[in-house]
């Protein structure tokens, strides 16, 4: 006769469940990050362009006008 325990060892199942939860959180975090990047790409490009114009254009214009 086989004796069955009333307290089975489910450590392996718990480890798999924890691994699945962790991977699910990583996938969700990646999805939210990507959605945020897509939502702000136009404003980011515009801000970068304006910053480049300020850093390059203003000194160039001052040089052309003879201020520097």
From Swiss-Prot:
Its main location: membrane. It comes from the Archaea. It is found in: Cell membrane. The keyword Coiled coil does not apply. GO terms for molecular function: tetrahydromethanopterin S-methyltransferase activity. It catalyses: 5-methyl-5,6,7,8-tetrahydromethanopterin + coenzyme M + 2 Na(+)(in) = 5,6,7,8-tetrahydromethanopterin + methyl-coenzyme M + 2 Na(+)(out). HAMAP family: MtrF (MF_01099). Belongs to the MtrF family. The complex is composed of 8 subunits; MtrA, MtrB, MtrC, MtrD, MtrE, MtrF, MtrG and MtrH. This is Tetrahydromethanopterin S-methyltransferase subunit F. The lineage of its organism: Archaea, Methanobacteriati, Methanobacteriota, Methanomada group, Methanobacteria.
């Amino acid at each position: 006769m086989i004796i069955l325990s009333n307290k089975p060892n489910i450590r392996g199942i718990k480890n798999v469940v924890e691994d699945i939860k962790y991977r699910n959180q990583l996938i969700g975090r990646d999805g939210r990050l990507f959605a945020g990047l897509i939502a702000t790409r136009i404003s980011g490009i515009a801000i970068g362009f304006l910053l480049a114009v300020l850093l390059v254009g203003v000194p160039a214009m001052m040089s052309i006008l003879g201020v520097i």
